C-alpha cells in the first residue's frame, strides 16, 4: 500500500526556492569537497549518495538518471510530519535494480572484450536479504536473474517466485530428503534447478528421489579450493571451508555418477573463495585454480556447462579503495574482466567450450539500497570551564596540575605537548586513587577533572594532524573529548555485524554537511549493554575511533544515517533487550522530482517481541490489571494506568516522542 503516492519532494535543492530558503548561504565548493573527503562519500556512495548544496545528503537511486534525486534529510522530515516513527529503514528498490544492471553490464563488456562465447547469469543468494521487496524488485528489473537457496525455507520462497524468472535456480547448503525432493519437483515443473552436491552423503538421496519422481536431476559439485581470500570472512573459503568436496571426493562423485549412468547430470562446477573479497589478486588466483577443475572434469568425460564462481564480489564500505577488510581494491569491470579472462584462457588453452558463468553476488547487489535513519535522543558533551587556582594549602597533586596549566601558557616553554599531557594524566590518576581512599573530596576531584579537560583542549589546539608524530596524541584526545551521542536504535538488531565482527558501516549526519567537521562523537545505542556502541568510523582515507561531526545544537541534534546496511543486517539482527524490527519504507524517485513512498514493514510492537519469548500480551495485561485493582488508587487513576500499559504493549519497541 502506498503511503504517499506523490510527496512532491524536489529532486534538487538548487532548483527549488522553497528549499533554498531553508539556508541563507549555500555550501561553497571548498566546504563540499572537504565534507566529501571526510566521509569518503564519493567512493562508498558510488554515485547513489552525495551532498547537495544545502549540506544535506541526497539520494540518486539510478545514476543513469541524475535528475531523479531526493534530499534525504527533507524526505525524513516530511515523513515524520506524516507520522513516520524512527528508527526506520529507508529502502531504495531502484538502487537494487541499478546494481543488477551494472553487474550484468560489466560482464557483458568483459565477454565482448575477450571474445567469450558463453552466457552470464547473476544468481541472487536470497540469504543476503530474503525480504519480499528485495526479491521482487530484482525479478521485476527486466534483467536476467537466477535465484539461490541455502535451506528448505529459502527454496520454498525461490520456487514460489521461479515462475517470474524462468531462469536458473541453484540449491546450496546442507540437504535432507525433503529439501532434495523440493528441488527435484522444481526441475520436474520445468525449472532449471541445479542441486549442488556439498557432501558425499547427498548423492545417494538425490539419485533415489530422482528415480521415485521419474526426473533427470541437474547436478552441480562444489569443489573445495586451496585458494583462499583474506579478511573477516576468509573461513568461508579454502581447504578448511565448511562446505565443498576435496579433490578425492570430487573423483569419487564422478565415479558414483558414472556407475549410476548419471554422469551427464553433472553440469555445474561451483566454488566459493569467501565473502567480501578485498583483493582482486585473490579472486584471480582462485578462478585460475577452479578453471583447472573445469578442465580436469572435462578430461574425465564430465560435460560441465555452468561455471559458478560463487560470491566474493565486495563493496567499499570504507571508501578507501584498499585491501582492508571493509574495502575493495577493484571495481565491477576489473572483477568481471578477471573472471572472464581466466575461464576463457583455460578453455582456449585446452580446446574446451566456454561455459555459462554464474556469480552469486548478493552483497554487491543489496548493500547500497538501504539506509537506517534514526534520531539522537541525548548528547553528553565534555564541556569544561577553567577552574580558579587552588588554595595555597591544597594537596600537592592539585598544585602540580595547576603549575602544569600555567606552564602551558608561558611563552618560550620547551616542554613537549606530550610531556604536559603525561604530567597532567599522572596527577589526575593520583587524585582518583586519593579520592577512593578519602584523601580528596568530591569538589577537589571535580576541580581536577575540569582542569584536565581544559589541558586536553589546549593541547588539542596546538597539535598538527599532518604531523605523523602527533597522530597518536590526536587520536587519544579525540576519544577523550568526543561527544557521547545516544541514538534511538539497537546495534544488535540493526547492525549486528558492527557488533559481531567489528564491520565498519558509513555513518554520518543527514544535514549540516555545509560546515567544517570541528567536533568528534561516539555513537551509543539504547540497549542496556556496553557493547552497544560503534567503535570505528570513516575519517578521510583512514579509520578513526570517533566520528567527525559538524557543529550542531545539542538541544536539536541532526538525524543520523547508517548507510549500506542492505546486506545481511536485517536478517542477522537479534532481539537483545526485546528491541524489534524497525519500520521500513520503500522510496521511489522519479525524474520530475516526485517521490513515491510505500510502507513495507510496520515494525515490531512490544507485544510482538513478548510473544517471541512466550510471554502472552493478554495474560500480561490481565496480571497487571489484577495488581492495579488491589491498590488503593482511585478508579480514574487505575483506568489511566491500565490504558497506558495496554498502549505500551501495542506500541513501538523504540523510544517515541510525545
Curated annotation (Swiss-Prot):
Top-level EC class: lyase
User: Pfam families from the entry?
Assistant: Arg_decarb_HB (PF17810), Arg_decarbox_C (PF17944), Orn_Arg_deC_N (PF02784)
Q: Which residues carry this modification: N6-(pyridoxal phosphate)lysine?
A: 127
Q: Which UniProt keywords are present, listed alphabetically?
A: Decarboxylase, Lyase, Magnesium, Metal-binding, Periplasm, Polyamine biosynthesis, Putrescine biosynthesis, Pyridoxal phosphate, Spermidine biosynthesis
Give the coiled coil ranges.
none
Q: Where in the cell is it found?
A: Periplasm
Q: What is its EC number?
A: 4.1.1.19
Give cofactor(s), names only.
Mg(2+); pyridoxal 5'-phosphate
Its subunit composition reads: Homotetramer.
Recorded hits in PANTHER family, A to Z, give: ARGININE DECARBOXYLASE, BIOSYNTHETIC ARGININE DECARBOXYLASE
Q: What does this protein do?
A: Catalyzes the biosynthesis of agmatine from arginine.
Q: Provide the protein name.
A: Biosynthetic arginine decarboxylase
Amino acid at each position: 500500500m502506498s503511503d504517499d503516492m506523490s510527496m512532491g519532494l524536489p529532486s534538487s535543492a538548487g532548483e527549488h526556492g522553497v528549499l533554498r530558503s531553508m539556508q541563507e548561504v549555500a555550501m561553497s565548493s571548498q566546504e563540499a569537497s572537504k565534507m566529501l573527503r571526510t566521509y569518503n562519500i564519493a567512493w562508498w556512495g558510488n554515485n547513489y549518495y552525495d551532498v547537495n548544496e544545502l549540506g544535506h545528503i541526497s539520494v540518486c537511486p539510478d545514476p543513469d538518471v541524475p535528475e531523479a534525486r531526493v534530499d534525504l534529510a527533507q524526505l525524513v522530515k516530511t515523513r515524520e510530519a506524516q507520522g513516520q516513527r524512527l528508527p526506520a529503514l529507508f529502502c531504495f528498490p531502484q538502487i537494487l535494480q541499478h546494481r543488477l544492471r551494472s553487474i550484468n553490464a560489466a560482464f557483458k563488456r568483459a565477454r565482448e572484450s575477450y571474445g567469450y562465447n558463453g552466457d552470464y547469469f547473476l544468481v541472487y543468494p536470497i540469504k543476503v536479504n530474503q525480504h519480499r521487496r528485495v526479491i521482487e524488485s530484482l525479478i521485476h528489473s527486466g534483467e536476467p536473474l537466477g535465484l539461490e537457496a541455502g535451506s528448505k525455507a529459502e527454496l520454498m520462497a525461490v520456487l514460489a517466485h521461479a515462475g517470474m524468472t524462468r531462469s536458473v535456480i541453484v540449491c546450496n547448503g546442507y540437504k535432507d530428503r525433503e529439501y532434495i525432493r523440493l528441488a527435484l519437483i522444481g526441475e520436474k515443473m520445468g525449472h532449471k534447478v541445479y542441486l549442488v552436491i556439498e557432501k558425499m552423503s547427498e548423492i545417494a538421496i538425490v539419485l533415489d528421489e530422482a528415480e521415485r519422481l521419474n526426473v533427470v536431476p541437474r547436478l552441480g559439485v562444489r569443489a573445495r579450493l586451496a585458494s583462499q581470500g583474506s579478511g573477516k570472512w576468509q573461513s568461508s573459503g579454502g581447504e578448511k571451508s565448511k562446505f565443498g568436496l576435496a579433490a578425492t571426493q570430487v573423483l569419487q562423485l564422478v565415479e558414483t555418477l558414472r556407475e549410476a549412468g548419471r554422469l551427464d547430470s553433472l553440469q555445474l562446477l561451483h566454488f566459493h573463495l569467501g565473502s567480501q573479497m578485498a583483493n582482486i589478486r585473490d579472486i584471480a588466483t582462485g578462478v585460475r585454480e577452479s578453471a583447472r577443475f573445469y578442465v580436469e572434469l572435462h578430461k574425465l568425460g564430465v560435460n560441465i556447462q555452468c561455471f559458478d564462481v560463487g560470491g566474493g564480489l565486495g563493496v567499499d564500505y570504507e571508501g578507501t579503495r584498499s585491501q582492508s577488510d571493509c574495502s575493495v581494491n577493484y571495481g565491477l569491470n576489473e572483477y568481471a574482466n578477471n573472471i572472464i579472462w581466466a575461464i576463457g584462457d583455460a578453455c582456449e588453452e585446452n580446446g574446451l567450450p566456454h561455459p555459462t558463468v554464474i556469480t552469486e553476488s548478493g552483497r554487491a547487489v543489496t548493500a547500497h539500497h538501504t539506509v537506517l535513519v534514526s534520531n539522537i535522543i541525548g548528547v553528553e558533551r565534555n564541556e569544561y570551564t577553567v577552574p580558579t587556582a587552588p588554595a595555597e594549602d591544597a594537596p600537592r597533586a592539585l598544585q602540580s596540575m595547576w603549575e602544569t596549566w600555567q606552564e602551558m601558557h608561558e611563552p618560550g616553554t620547551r616542554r613537549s605537548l606530550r610531556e604536559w599531557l603525561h604530567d597532567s594524566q599522572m596527577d589526575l590518576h593520583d587524585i582518583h586513587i586519593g579520592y577512593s581512599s578519602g584523601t580528596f573530596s568530591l569538589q577537589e576531584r571535580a576541580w581536577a577533572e575540569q582542569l584536565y579537560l581544559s589541558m586536553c583542549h589546549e593541547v588539542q589546539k596546538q597539535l598538527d594532524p599532518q604531523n605523523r608524530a602527533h597522530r597518536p596524541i590526536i587520536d587519544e584526545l579525540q576519544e577523550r573529548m568526543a561527544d557521547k551521542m545516544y541514538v534511538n536504535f539497537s546495534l544488535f538488531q540493526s547492525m549486528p555485524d558492527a557488533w559481531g565482527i567489528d564491520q565498519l558501516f558509513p555513518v554520518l549526519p543527514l544535514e549540516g554537511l555545509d560546515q567544517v567537521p570541528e567536533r568528534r562523537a561516539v555513537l551509543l545505542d539504547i540497549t542496556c549493554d556496553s557493547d552497544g556502541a560503534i567503535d570505528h568510523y570513516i575519517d578521510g582515507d583512514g579509520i578513526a575511533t570517533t566520528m567527525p561531526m559538524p557543529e550542531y545544537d545539542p538541544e536539536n541534534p541532526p538525524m543520523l544515517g547508517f548507510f549500506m546496511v542492505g546486506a545481511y543486517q536485517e536478517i542477522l539482527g537479534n532481539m537483545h533487550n526485546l528491541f524489534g524490527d524497525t519500520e521500513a519504507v520503500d522510496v521511489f524517485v522519479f525524474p520530475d522530482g516526485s517521490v513515491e513512498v510505500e510502507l513495507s514493514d510496520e515494525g515490531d510492537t512490544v507485544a510482538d517481541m513478548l510473544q517471541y519469548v512466550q510471554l502472552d500480551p493478554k495474560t500480561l495485561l490481565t496480571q497487571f490489571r489484577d495488581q492495579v485493582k488491589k491498590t488503593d488508587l482511585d478508579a480514574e487513576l487505575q483506568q489511566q494506568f491500565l490504558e497506558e500499559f495496554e498502549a505500551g504493549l501495542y506500541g513501538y519497541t523504540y523510544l517515541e516522542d510525545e
